[in-house]
């Protein structure tokens, strides 16, 4: 966020040293911590590669796709999740730098421009981004792994209540999306992110996604042993059968019920 000093103040008796507040006409920023992250991104080519998965069908544009991707990515990293924040951040010198511009260059994209940009993303582009995420995960390994343990988890993502496919979830007591992440226990990397509507069942599309992941991993590493773990939300016959057909090991939690309790009491007492 932009900061700008107003009045010069000198404190003579705040300890052993004189403290002086100096007026500056230059716009300052409280988000300089993004600069080393942007340097890491430059070396990895992450945001540039991400933006390359999107199509730009605009006949005329003032803001490049990669700039808008960086605006949103680095904004979220800095805690500015709302598009409205960028009505202020678009003139922040640090955000200009991390987007690829000079600090004294023209302002970045406004909130309406960012909204149009995000709403223009197609289903095909989302599939490309899923594939891109999986390829980035594969590239995170220096050597072919002997085995992989994939954790599949569902997270709530609160919303303002008016976005497309956001619904009120009684358990979380909020309007939300749900995010399903496939992460790797060996290196904590995200292998496959999926955004679901606010009241979606945890199992929605999980087996097609898992099949897609397993087939790609085995195409790259034919001998890798794959196992996955999930909570009781994934416990269903079609998930067990699908995992067996993919020849993967799996550990899935079970919700407590009277039959399970009765059959497990003796074992749990050991």
Where are these regions (language model features)?
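An internal, acidic/charged active-site-proximal segment
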Residues: 195-270
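Dynamic "connector" segments at or just before major functional cores
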Residues: 1-201, 207-220, 246
């Amino acid at each position: 966020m932009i900061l700008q000093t107003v009045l010069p103040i000198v404190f003579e008796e705040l300890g052993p040293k004189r403290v002086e507040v100096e007026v500056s006409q230059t716009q300052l920023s409280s988000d300089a911590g993004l600069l080393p992250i942007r340097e890491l991104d430059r070396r990895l080519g992450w945001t540039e590669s991400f933006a390359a998965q999107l199509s730009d069908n605009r006949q005329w544009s003032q803001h490049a796709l990669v700039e808008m991707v960086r605006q949103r990515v680095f904004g979220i990293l800095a805690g500015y999740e709302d598009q409205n924040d960028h009505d202020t951040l678009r003139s922040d010198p640090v955000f200009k730098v991390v987007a690829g511009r000079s600090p004294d260059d023209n302002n970045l994209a406004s909130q309406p421009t960012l909204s149009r940009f995000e709403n223009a993303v197609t289903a095909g582009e989302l599939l490309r981004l899923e594939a891109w995420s999986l390829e980035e995960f594969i590239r995170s390994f220096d050597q072919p792994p002997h085995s992989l343990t994939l954790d599949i988890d569902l997270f709530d993502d609160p919303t303002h209540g008016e976005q497309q496919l956001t619904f009120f979830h009684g358990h979380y007591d909020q309007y939300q999306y749900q995010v399903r992440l496939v992460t790797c226990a060996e290196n904590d990397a995200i292998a496959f992110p999926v955004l679901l509507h606010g009241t979606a069942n945890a199992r929605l599309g999980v087996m097609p996604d898992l099949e897609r992941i397993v087939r790609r991993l085995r195409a790259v590493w034919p001998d890798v042993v794959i196992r996955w773990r999930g909570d009781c939300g994934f416990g269903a016959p079609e998930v067990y059968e699908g995992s067996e057909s993919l020849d993967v090991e799996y550990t899935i939690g079970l919700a407590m019920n009277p039959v399970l309790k009765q059959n497990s009491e003796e074992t749990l007492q050991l």
